[in-house]
Curated annotation (Swiss-Prot):
Keywords: 4Fe-4S, Iron, Iron-sulfur, Lyase, Metal-binding, Nucleotide-binding, S-adenosyl-L-methionine, tRNA processing. Its cofactor is [4Fe-4S] cluster. InterPro entries: Aldolase_TIM, Flavdoxin-like, Flavodoxin/NO_synth, Flavoprotein-like_sf, rSAM, tRNA_wybutosine-synth, tRNA_wybutosine-synthase. [4Fe-4S] cluster binds at residues 357, 361, 364. The gene is tyw1. This is S-adenosyl-L-methionine-dependent tRNA 4-demethylwyosine synthase.
Length: 688
């Protein structure tokens, strides 16, 4: 239907309102729809923000590893309540000591807490002899740690403990906050404020407190420190007051708030009150790397080693006269090295250019008095100084035997010229940065070198030059048993040992596996030893029963762990049987070549050292030095010598030119040698 303009004009006023409504209606509808959409999007955005916020709250409580792994949040959420189940939480008192003071303090803390908390299950643990990874990388859930630490300006095992904490914090393989599962911790430090003031006072206890907290643990009580120059009674009173404050905190079931230290004696300072002292405390050590002495003359380590008969040379070397040297000078017999290799004991010097070691072996006869470490961080003495020092100290010790009843004049005269050097005294000789230069100086003086390594430094072994005889200690055949026997410091100790054995196979020189048998620890898995022999294919295998070196709080060994000689023989025979069965593809055969019954020692050798049906395990020393001077390549068969009949298996291994000495006992007469082997073993035999 059409409308004219005239008609629209006549009726415009009548229909104008309706027309406006029709035209504006789509706009209104569009506006309403858009408004509704905006409100809907706003609600969704708000919900999304709430969800993100919730996720962030959850993540805040989760352990996130440095590789991005997320752990359980339960422990951290629980920790928000600051509650402690002190009746059921494992409680450990740790300590480290050189002179014994910190040990006495730790025992005092242990006894006081046991009494106050009415608990008989509190553990007292020496940091030097526990697996640090079991306590400070993975820890017992809800455990409570108390740490009693002295501080030394000299090198000590505390340096290794602190470096382990720092490495755990920096190691991407270690989950973040590994100690978050602890209910709490507290540290007590001992320091000499008069002699070591300022930033040296209790600096290692301060570092321990700092690193344990960085690893996720929550401080149970402020760090306590005491001045050891106070009167003994004042020191003990201060220690007990700190211990009681910890016990009170545990009984209250809550973490002690910072600043709540009114109960502490004025003789005990907490970390918050130390102010600038805490700020000054060095992050690593009191002295830069390379300036600390491994064994200072003022250190408890020095005093302990000298008390045991060692002469400490320079800052990290040592020498000692072994019992077999004294025995040989009296004509009472030589050690097993004479039976096996032709070394006359009075011509041999036992020494080491490194008193530090990377293991804390259960059968070590130093009872923890030598330093430990995984990397060289000390002052380095030059090899010339070390060689001159150990020779001087060795000869000085020998002079003390002049005129001693029973000493043979000809043996005493011969002993004034060292012919052999056994680098097996203590520690890890190959650890010394200039070991090759040191050995070369020995050879220049025509002193043979017998170097023993614990198979924990593969790079040093790979770079090791020619020695007269190169040993690797193989103290166990499985990873777990090696960990139990050697208590190594390296986390990858097993891989390091396997690598060292492979490197040994590449060496074109006389190589030896030294196996120390510890009953109840490493005598069961005989078959597994054959696989280790496959890796290194040594020229010789020395098998020796462990020497009992006396009781020690740090060693679990007793006389029950010392095998009888018959048991050592049985082990060797079974080992050879397994080698014949499982290593036929190598084309190498092993047999028993020699023995030294008095030392519970047997030598197994490759049959290649049997010439015309007779063993040649001894060494032609003049020939060896002649070959060294040519500077040409040579091998182990180029300087071998005939083994004497007395050393053959079945003949005992005692030199016929000497007289066997039997120590008389008040309660019994001498027994046959086969029955008394384990009982006559001495510290020096283990060192020989």
């Amino acid at each position: 239907m059409g409308y004219s303009l005239g008609y629209i004009g006549e009726h415009w006023e009548e229909y104008r309102a309706v027309l406006y409504i029709v035209l504006l209606l789509p706009v209104l509808i569009h506006f309403l729809i858009r408004r509704k959409t905006q409100l809907s999007n706003s609600d969704k955005s708000s919900e999304k923000k709430d969800e993100v916020k919730k996720q962030r709250e959850v993540k805040r409580f989760k352990r996130v590893g440095k590789r991005g792994k997320i752990g359980s949040p339960s422990s951290s959420i629980r920790k928000q309540n600051d509650t402690i189940d002190w009746k059921n939480s494992p409680l450990c008192v740790f300590y480290s000591t050189l002179g014994g003071t910190a040990e006495r303090y730790a025992k005092q803390v242990h006894e006081e807490l046991s009494s106050l908390l009415q608990r008989d299950d509190i553990q007292l643990l020496n940091l030097d002899y526990v697996d640090l990874s079991e306590y400070f990388v993975s820890c017992p859930e809800n455990a409570i740690y108390l740490v009693v630490l002295p501080s030394y300006e000299i090198e000590s095992s505390i340096d290794y403990y602190l470096s382990s904490l720092q490495e755990s914090f920096s190691d991407f393989r270690v989950p973040k906050d590994p100690l978050h599962g602890l209910s709490g911790y507290a540290v007590f430090g001992l320091g000499d404020m008069e002699n070591y003031p300022g930033d040296k006072f209790c600096y290692q206890a301060i570092q321990a407190d700092k690193w344990i907290k960085k690893l996720g643990a929550r401080r149970l009580a402020p760090l306590g420190v005491v001045n050891t120059q106070l009167a003994p009674t004042a020191q003990i009173d201060a220690l007990l007051q700190w211990t009681r404050s910890v016990a009170e905190c545990l009984k209250n079931g809550t973490l002690l708030k910072i600043g709540n230290t009114d109960s502490l004696s004025s003789d005990v300072m907490d970390v918050e009150d130390m102010g600038s002292m805490m700020a000054k405390a060095k992050a690593e050590a009191a002295l830069p790397v390379g300036t600390k002495e491994m064994v200072s003359t003022e250190s408890p380590t020095y005093k302990a080693l000298t008390k045991q008969g060692y002469s400490v040379v320079g800052s990290h070397s040592g020498v000692k006269i072994c019992r077999w040297t004294k025995s040989a000078m009296r004509g009472r017999g030589f050690c097993y090295k004479y039976s096996f290799y032709g070394i006359r004991s009075h011509l041999c010097m036992e020494a080491t250019p490194s008193l530090a070691c990377a293991n804390k072996c259960t059968f070590c006869w130093r009872h923890g008095t030598n330093p430990v470490g995984t990397s060289w961080r000390w002052k380095v003495d030059p090899p010339e100084m070390i060689l001159q020092g150990i020779l001087k100290a060795h000869y000085a010790k020998l002079k003390l035997m002049k005129g001693v009843p029973g000493v043979l004049p000809d043996r005493y005269e011969e002993a004034s010229r060292v012919r052999h050097c056994a680098l097996s005294l203590v520690g890890e000789p190959i650890f010394y940065p200039y070991i090759n230069e040191f050995v070369s100086m020995l050879h220049e003086r025509e002193i043979s070198s017998f170097l023993v390594t614990n198979a924990q430094h593969p790079e040093a072994l790979r770079n090791m030059g020619m020695v007269t005889q190169l040993y690797v200690s193989v103290d166990a055949s499985t990873k777990q048993s090696l960990k139990s026997v050697d208590r190594p410091l390296f986390k990858d100790f097993w891989e390091r040992m396997l690598t060292c054995l492979e490197i040994l196979r590449e060496k074109r020189q006389r190589t030896v596996y030294r196996m120390t048998l510890v009953k109840g620890f490493n005598m069961e898995q005989i078959k597994e030893y054959t696989e280790l022999i496959r890796l290194g294919v040594p020229c010789f295998i020395e098998v020796k029963g462990v020497t009992y070196s006396g009781n020690s709080d740090q060693s679990p060994l007793t006389m029950k762990n010392v095998p009888y000689y018959e048991e050592v023989i049985d082990f060797v025979k079974k080992l050879i049987e397994y080698i014949d069965i499982h290593l036929q593809d190598l084309g190498v055969r092993y047999e028993i070549a020699a023995e030294h019954a008095h030392s519970c020692s047997i030598l197994v050798a490759q049959t290649a050292f049997k010439k015309d049906g007779h063993w040649h395990t001894h060494i032609d020393y003049p020939k060896f030095f002649e070959l060294i001077r040519t500077k040409k390549d040579f091998g182990p068969f180029d300087y071998m010598a005939s083994t004497p009949d007395f050393a053959m298996f079945g003949n005992g291994g005692f030199s016929p030119e000497d007289t066997r000495f039997h120590r008389k006992k008040k309660t019994q007469t001498s027994k046959p040698i086969s029955a008394t082997i384990s009982e006559t073993a001495t510290i020096s035999e283990a060192a020989a």
